[in-house]
């Protein structure tokens, strides 16, 4: 199962990449929303782990771009974000095609693997 992690926090992406690789996932990482979008457009992923709060080109920007190009419904996106993001925003995002779950940081690794396995 191949997974793309899009998060600007390199320590988080390194930790998640190592853990998921040990669990048998093939993992690619982008520390930038624009590069993440480019990878999504070029490759097929079983799931995309997407941080909402990134500088310059956020996870919300990436989702909006995928919606505009009618590509969101073809994705499996699991959001992960800081607790500062409101529940209303999370609820509205979870109603969009392609967005399957939202995990709050700090992400519990066992919950992440369980969520990935369920999608």
Language-model region placement:
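Short acidic/polar segment at the start of the alpha1 helix of CheY-like receiver
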Residues: 9-13, 86, 109
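Receiver (REC) domain active-site loop signature in two-component systems and cognate sites
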Residues: 54
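Hydrophobic/aromatic residues positioned on beta-strands within the core alpha/beta folds
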Residues: 80-82
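Short hydrophobic/Thr-rich beta-strand motif most characteristic of the beta2 strand and flanking loop
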Residues: 24-31, 39, 103
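Active-site residues of response regulator receiver
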Residues: 51
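Alpha4 helix (beta4-alpha4-beta5 surface) of REC/receiver domains from two-component response regulators
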Residues: 61, 84-102, 110, 114
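Acidic catalytic/metal-coordinating carboxylates
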Residues: 31-35, 58-64
């Amino acid at each position: 199962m191949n997974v793309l992690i899009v998060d600007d926090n390199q320590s988080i992406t390194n930790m998640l990449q190592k853990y998921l690789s040990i669990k048998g996932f093939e993992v690619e990482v982008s520390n930038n929303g624009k590069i993440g979008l480019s990878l999504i457009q070029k490759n097929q992923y079983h799931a995309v782990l997407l941080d909402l709060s990134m500088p310059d080109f956020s996870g919300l920007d990436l989702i909006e771009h995928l919606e505009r190009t009618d590509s969101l419904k073809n994705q499996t996106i699991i959001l992960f974000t800081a607790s500062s993001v409101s529940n209303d925003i999370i609820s509205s995002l979870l109603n969009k095609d392609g967005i399957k779950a939202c995990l709050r940081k700090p992400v519990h690794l066992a919950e992440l693997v369980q969520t990935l396995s369920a999608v």
